[in-house]
Amino acid sequence: MKLFIDTANVDDIREVASWGVLSGVTTNPSLVAKEGRDFMQVLREILEIVDGPISAEVISLQADDMVEEARQYYELHKNIVIKLPMTAEGLKACARLSAKGVRCNMTLIFSPNQALLCARAGAAFVSPFVGRLDDISTDGIQLIRDTAEIFDLHGIDTEIIAASIRTPGQVVEAAKAGAHIATIPPKVFHQMLKHPLTDSGIERFLKDWEAAKGRV
């Protein structure tokens, strides 16, 4: 399973990219607004850091407007992926953009039916929201599992991005359920680094090393 980072913070992207684990980036209007910066400039900086799919989300609600808004993004670089909402208008825009060879990431997926519609509209990626389903006592990982089963059964090439990830455990479960990608907030990336036995093991190695030096 590939790992994307879900943020518009360039410093966070640069930090996690330095670990050698990133394959792409996802953003959304809320993340962009949080940074308070010009989005086109942010995209240019991200493109210099990560050589992989970079999802840029439109804010328009009508298909014609979505397609027009998307142009400024996909003309910027071949790695830009257009992120569209799972609506009838979003599907129309996806079909039109995909026909031009523009990759689309359909977001706000909460059912296998929605994922299937997006795949048939030509989406390169679908983004089921794990955490938000868990918030309403629904099994978000089961959505990943069901979608992966349908795609495998029918030879659908659309990649599944496990989104709305809240914990390291959800990353593992998404991988086991068949997600091709997990898009992960910076905070969860840092949590994935940690284990108490790793910390205590490093501390013990250092103590043993110092003790050995003292005996020389």
From Swiss-Prot:
Q: Tell me its EC number(s), please.
A: 2.2.1.2
Q: Where does this protein reside within or beyond the cell?
A: Cytoplasm
Keyword line? Cytoplasm, Pentose shunt, Schiff base, Transferase
Name its pathway. Answer: Carbohydrate degradation; pentose phosphate pathway; D-glyceraldehyde 3-phosphate and beta-D-fructose 6-phosphate from D-ribose 5-phosphate and D-xylulose 5-phosphate (non-oxidative stage): step 2/3
Q: Which Gene3D superfamilies match?
A: Aldolase class I (3.20.20.70)
Q: List, in alphabetical order, the GO biological process terms annotated in this UniProt record.
A: carbohydrate metabolic process; pentose-phosphate shunt
The cellular component terms of Gene Ontology attached to this UniProt record, alphabetical and capped at eight, are:
cytoplasm
Task: Identify the InterPro entries for this entry.
Answer: Aldolase_TIM, TAL/FSA, Transaldolase_3B, Transaldolase_3B/F6P_aldolase, Transaldolase_AS, TSA/FSA_arc/bac
Q: List the SUPFAM superfamilies.
A: Aldolase
Molecular functions (GO terms):
aldehyde-lyase activity; transaldolase activity
Per the database entry, which stretches of residues form a coiled coil? none
The protein's superkingdom reads: Bacteria
Catalytic activity from the UniProt record: D-sedoheptulose 7-phosphate + D-glyceraldehyde 3-phosphate = D-erythrose 4-phosphate + beta-D-fructose 6-phosphate
Residues annotated as the enzyme's active site: 83 (schiff-base intermediate with substrate)
UniProt cross-references to PANTHER family, sorted A to Z? TRANSALDOLASE
Q: Which protein family is it in?
A: Belongs to the transaldolase family. Type 3B subfamily.
What does the UniProt function comment say about this protein? Transaldolase is important for the balance of metabolites in the pentose-phosphate pathway.
Record's protein name: Probable transaldolase
Gene source species: Symbiobacterium thermophilum (strain DSM 24528 / JCM 14929 / IAM 14863 / T)
